[in-house]
From Swiss-Prot:
GO MF: ribosomal small subunit binding
Function: One of several proteins that assist in the late maturation steps of the functional core of the 30S ribosomal subunit. Associates with free 30S ribosomal subunits (but not with 30S subunits that are part of 70S ribosomes or polysomes). Required for efficient processing of 16S rRNA. May interact with the 5'-terminal helix region of 16S rRNA.
NCBIfam families: rbfA
A Pfam cross-reference name: RBFA
InterPro entries: KH_dom-like_a/b, RbfA, RbfA_dom_sf
Gene Ontology annotations for the cellular component aspect, listed alphabetically: cytosol
Official protein name in the record: Ribosome-binding factor A
Record keywords: Cytoplasm, Ribosome biogenesis
GO biological process, alphabetically ordered: maturation of SSU-rRNA
Keyword Cytoplasm found: yes
Family annotation (PANTHER family): RIBOSOME-BINDING FACTOR A, CHLOROPLASTIC-RELATED (PTHR33515:SF1)
Subunit structure: Monomer. Binds 30S ribosomal subunits, but not 50S ribosomal subunits or 70S ribosomes.
UniProt keyword Cytoplasm present: yes
């Protein structure tokens, strides 16, 4: 008996739809004051669509408090997604703060510091030595 396999493309399509719908639902339906301006960066689905890791960033407020509030509202968001999505299983939502931007800024800062140090060392090496 052959099993029907879902294509990886379907997984990506559903993740993208969940990302779009969650962005709108969080903005319009969630009234928790701990949730400021939130951007859903990406959604990762398990192959069986049972769980979804939702990565977000926030412009205002504490990321930890926002994550706690979003995870608290995940049941309500799950129910709202169920009404919008036409799939058999709507995944359980798990919200995670996306630190990619902070890590990129820190890495860029380290690179800038290394370049400045190298330029300073090169300038000192090129300077003529003083005779006493």
């Amino acid at each position: 008996m052959s099993r029907k396999r879902t294509s990886p493309n379907r997984n990506v399509q559903i993740a993208d739809q969940i990302q779009r719908d969650l962005s709108e639902l969080i903005m319009r339906e969630v009234k928790d004051p701990r949730i400021g301006i939130v951007t859903i960066q990406s959604v990762e689905l398990t192959p069986d669509y049972a769980h979804a890791k939702v990565y977000f960033t926030t412009l205002t407020g504490d990321p930890a408090a926002t994550q706690q509030a979003l995870n608290h509202a995940s049941g309500h968001l799950h129910n709202l997604l169920f009404k919008r999505l036409h799939i058999h299983t709507v995944p359980t939502l798990h919200f995670h703060y996306d630190q990619t931007i902070e890590k990129a800024v820190a890495m860029s800062r380290l690179i800038d510091e290394a370049n400045a140090t190298r330029a300073k060392d090169d300038d000192e090496a090129d300077a003529p030595a003083k005779d006493d």
